Amino acid sequence: MPETARLVTRDELKSYMNTGTSAVPVWSLIGEGFTALSENKNPKTYARKYIHERTERTDVIGYAPSVPFTADVHTVDPVIAKIQEIYNGEKVGADAQVEILTVREWDIGTVVGTYKAIKRTYSTVCDKEGDGTDALVISGTFHAVSNISNGTFDGDKFTAAA
């Protein structure tokens, strides 16, 4: 019998940041304090109109993904700590890069207990801290610096697809 369609809720789309190292990753949930985190694919297009046609053609030739974020600063949260370390230290280049997993919990992996996931490296561009009068707020944008790596995530470990 075919699966019944259901509405996917926002809490089923999870993001995790590697707050460890490349050699020993620690995937920390991007959640506590975050009030905005949504991906923009920012497709790059090539448009042209040939002399024998009435309609212009447009092809997608690339992407420039970005993920704007806004977060209330919480103490002892490893994701907020990593972002603040980059912001307060005015880090640049590879020192401002983070790995982020995007996990779709409604999209089950082939191994029991796993979900399909995408890993990508982003440059962290924090543009301001201090908005708000109730809580300290930090905001910025993660800008893609790598291609995606498809795989699965079991809540602790990312396994790249073969």
Indicate residue ranges for each PLM-predicted region.
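Intrinsically disordered, low-complexity segments enriched in small/polar residues
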Residues: 18, 29-31, 87, 91, ...
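Extended hydrophobic/Leu-rich segments
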Residues: 13-17, 100, 151, 158
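Short, surface-exposed linear patches
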Residues: 59, 89-95, 144-146, 162
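Surface-exposed, hydrophilic segments of mature proteins
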Residues: 4-6, 22-23, 92, 104, ...
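Short, acidic/charged, Gly/Pro-enriched secondary-structure junctions
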Residues: 80-116
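Mixed-charge, glycine-accented linear interaction segment located at domain edges/termini
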Residues: 117-162
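Short, cysteine-centered beta-strand-loop-beta hairpins and adjacent loop/turn segments enriched
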Residues: 74-80, 148-152
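Solvent-exposed edge beta-strands and adjacent loop segments
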Residues: 1-75, 121-136
